[in-house]
Amino acid sequence: MGSGPIDPLELLKGLDNILGQGGEVKALEGMAKIFNLMKQSQKMVNRCIYLNIVLQTHSPDILSKFIRVGGYKLLNNWLTYARTCNNSPLLHQILLTLQHLPLTVDHLKQNNTAKLVKQLSKSSEDEELRKLAGILVNDWMAVIRSQTNIQPADKEKKKKKEDAKGSSPVLDKTSEAKSEDNGDKKEKPKIQRTTAPSHAKFRSTGLEVEASSLVPVKKPTPVPVLSDKYLKPVPVKRQSSVPVPGDAAPAEKKYKPLNIVPNTTKEIKVKIIPPQPIESLGFLDALNSAPVPGIKIKKKKKAVSPTSNKASPFDSKSPTEASSLTKPSSPEPEPPVEGMEVERPGTPVPAIELPEPMEISAPPPPAPSETKPSEADASQLTKKGKKRKTVSWPEESRLREYFYFELDETERVNVNKIKDFGEAAKREMLKDRQAFQNARRHSHDTMEEVIPWVLPRLLNLPGALVQMGSNSTEKHAQAEREMGILQEIFLSKESVPDTPHEPDPESYEPSPPKLIPLDEDCSMDDGVYPESMDQSTESQSPDLNGAKLPPVLANLMGSMGSSKSPPNTLPGTMQEILTSIMGAQGNAKPEDLMKQPDFSEKIKHLLGSLQNQNQNQGPPGPAGQGSQGPVNIGFPPPSQKNHQPPPPHHQPPPPHYPPPGPNGPFQGPHGPPGGPRMMGPPPPQRDGYWEPPPNENLRGGSHHGGERGGMRGGDRGPPPPPFHRNRGGRGGEPGYRGRGRGGERGHPGRNGPYGMGHGDHRGHEGHRGHGGHGDHRGHGHGGDMSTRPTCRHFMMKGNCRYENNCAFYHPGINGPPLP
């Protein structure tokens, strides 16, 4: 068939000449063609169509033709393939086809189709498929049973015919009896196990030949026993049992010669059996005498006296039952002969009709007690051969039983508990089968996507009903804890602790901080030099004291302080600008001042007015002093080498030192006394000390205590900054305390009366000379060093151990700072 997709209608049209109106095969030749097409088909569509064609065909000849040409074997191959692939629809179709075919036992033996179907009926996961397989198995079992029963029945018929021919001289029976026996035989094979008991009956019939002489002897004795009511069977049977043994002995002797005559028939027991049931009239009398010994044996097992009476009336009323009972008893009457007892178990005729013969076969040895067997005989007769059942009640104390169970809340019920081993085995088999099929199915799985992925729709979940941590007190405790504990920083994953608990406290010994002296031990001065007490030059503008200035204004005010004009005499325009910037805000923060919309415009205007003032207005001073250039705001002016500075009153001091007042003492380094401090950036520092002013010899000067009485004069330059560790002269203007050599009492200084010197030396007024010290040790490389290479130690560490003796450039120390 083609490799492309197949249209079922086209396929059926191609088979139109073979098929009838209902889709069935019309002729035998057509079935052969269908079989050839089935062998070549590989697609599921083709196979299903062909299976349906076979299902629609109902002619037994055509179906038999299909089986003969090999259709049954082909279905076996398809069944194996479908079971391997776990194709349930195909399996269902194949099972229906197998159920439709007229299979025989020989066909079922050809391959393992029956075995596969039986496995499907037990282990299939599909419930419908399992039921269908079970029905098919039951149908096949019925076929097997019917055929196996028919075959032995035919064989028995042949044997019976031969036996009847051989036994005809012994028996005077007519051919009608044989035909009746054969009819009985035909009926008996339907019940498989009735054949053996029928033989036992026939044995009893063999005894029936001479039963006429036995009948008159035993009839009178058992009849009165049977006529008695049910309540008095025990004594009657005991009486009857006494004469019975005497009668039974001659009867047994008579039976023996009868049995001996047809010894050949004994050897072939089956042959003797058929004629005996016909002669039931005379045989009943013999049975009445025979059952007593047989029943004795049974009674040994069950000694029940009260019900024995009921047995006798039933015996007389039902001759057929009596005959069945006599058959086992007849062989027993001969206690000395064991051969008869051996024959008894082989005659289970009553076993089918009555369950007694099983008991009869077991108890043959105990024959001595004769009274008990008679009672048992009566009991069995009353029950029609059924076992006696008794009803009893327990004692009153045991009528009620109470069971107390305590509730265990922790107890768990195992719902999946397996009830029995059968269920466990079935589950295990299903699991193994599923695992095997999965392994085979996934062995060639290429893991390709078969079902396309579809993005699931979004779920609209309701909002949280409870706000997490809304009433939590732990978060406040955690916040308080974090306020007193430093944050732990982990630089690597290995340093992260396993648990979030607090780290172990580190053990350390607190040590007092080291005190680093700012002066040498030999220095005698203590404390910081107090600021000047002159409050005459307080700034006039309240805005300079009232608020913190922004950095721009602070630099501006610092430049104004270093300008040639007095700081307290501001131009009107500048005063108005400052008042407009700061007056309205009061004590506002600098950030708020800078947020004003026209802040930048006001600053530009202020700077412009200040520049014009510096250019057009010369500083007051002696004649010959020229005007200075624009003020450097926030940066020291470039140093001048080999330049003789003008007198201190007219030289513009560096930005680190405000110029002295017109009439007052030299102002402090932080601006005019009493004025706002920090009006500009502090002077550059080096290792925590003020930078020495440029253009100085660092050897004392006019501020160092005068000329020392003609010794070292006052041409040493400006004083060192405060707290600078040099050995210059100590004295000078009142705001500075330097170290230098105290001069002798010289001429009075320019600022007032003589100062006090150390060691009979006097300095200028207000300067206490501290004699006895050598010259300044830090000089040697003065002036601007910016032309030299930068000191790498100073750039890396921020300091240099050579300090001012270093031959390299220290930005901001021995030269201007870096841009």
Curated annotation (Swiss-Prot):
One of its GO terms (biological process) is RNA polymerase II promoter clearance. A motif (PP1-binding motif) lies at residues 386-415. Pfam families: Med26, zf-CCCH. It comes from the Eukaryota. Residues 635-663, 670-695 have a biased composition (Pro residues). It is found in: Nucleus; Chromosome. Residues 151-204, 296-391, 495-785 are annotated as: Disordered. SUPFAM superfamilies: Conserved domain common to transcription factors TFIIS, elongin A, CRSP70. A zinc finger (C3H1-type) spans 785-813. The keyword Metal-binding applies. Residues 73-147 form the TFIIS N-terminal domain. One of its GO terms (molecular function) is protein phosphatase regulator activity. The keyword Metal-binding applies. Residues 305-327, 533-543, 560-578 have a biased composition (Polar residues). Substrate-recognition component of the PNUTS-PP1 protein phosphatase complex, a protein phosphatase 1 (PP1) complex that promotes RNA polymerase II transcription pause-release, allowing transcription elongation. Promoter-proximal pausing by RNA polymerase II is a transcription halt following transcription initiation but prior to elongation, which acts as a checkpoint to control that transcripts are favorably configured for transcriptional elongation. The TFIIS N-terminal domain specifically recognizes disordered sequences in protein substrates that are then dephosphorylated by PPP1CA (or PPP1CB or PPP1CC). This is Serine/threonine-protein phosphatase 1 regulatory subunit 10.
